[in-house]
């Protein structure tokens, strides 16, 4: 199943516990679910540290995991104790957020600052149980982007080289060489579809 739902973006989620211990973990069940306002979701198998911290203080950040940070991301996936600081374990520096308390990964070229909106218990979660699958939805209240990746007002995502999760232990990476542009077709007055022609005209459809 997971090998077919691919590639999947990686949500590198940072939270803070009640005793101010930092937590950092990657989640490949992650994606945007709405824009204007912006919402993201990630799904946790069992009530893990990230979920507990988010439900306690209502905030998290999501840093973009890239080719350059792949080793740190992998270290932060280790199933360590609840009070372990994965930033320290992975030798990753933090950078302060503007609108939430949890920091972002300093080396990440982009990050989202989020407020917890809702946790949805999927059907395999028994009442009061910490076992099963939990979907966490957050509203994005702030966005950080490294200026060097903004060109003519457009984010050059491919230059960031974000990682993607495949199946099994496989990963992918987005690069300028593996991306391409396709214009969407238009519908003519007679109802027929007209194929897009030429270069992208700069209009989002």
Language model feature labels by segment:
Residues 1-205:
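Basic, polyanion-binding surface patches
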